[in-house]
């Protein structure tokens, strides 16, 4: 059986988990409320501030789904209690970002500024024009938004210009010699 799927998810105080028909799980906390529909191959049980996920049968898929469901549920619990944060750095002459409400204005060397509309549940702040901090309760959505922003101008391998994650290492190439 999946080793991750065997571990119970500890529910901190202030967080409630409810399981509805069709494996629809709703997690409520101080920061947000998240809901997700999981595979019918797993069963959820919540008791004494601990949630456990068990596969319905011993098929390979059900066992794999139990580990996946446990990891997602753990991220949902952490997201509604603490929240998640992703930092992006912008490197390049004239490359800037500015957060305005639920929009992010990016100047990335195109002939026009790029306006990225943030989805509900994600907030952005720009402490410096070359730094973006994305915050949200949904880890999956936060990663998707960060990836979409990075996609506008990926770091190039010669000078390293572009949008990158804060902890990302960009391998640099040497310029062609004549």
From Swiss-Prot:
PROSITE patterns for this protein: RIBOSOMAL_L6_1
Record's keyword terms, sorted: Ribonucleoprotein, Ribosomal protein, RNA-binding, rRNA-binding
MF terms in GO: rRNA binding; structural constituent of ribosome
Gene3D superfamilies: Ribosomal protein L6, alpha-beta domain
UniProt cross-references to Pfam families, sorted A to Z: Ribosomal_L6
GO cellular component: cytosolic large ribosomal subunit
GO biological process: cytoplasmic translation
Sequence similarity: Belongs to the universal ribosomal protein uL6 family.
Subunit structure: Part of the 50S ribosomal subunit.
Function of the molecule: This protein binds to the 23S rRNA, and is important in its secondary structure. It is located near the subunit interface in the base of the L7/L12 stalk, and near the tRNA binding site of the peptidyltransferase center.
Protein name according to UniProt: Large ribosomal subunit protein uL6
Record organism: Francisella tularensis subsp. novicida (strain U112)
Chain's gene name: rplF
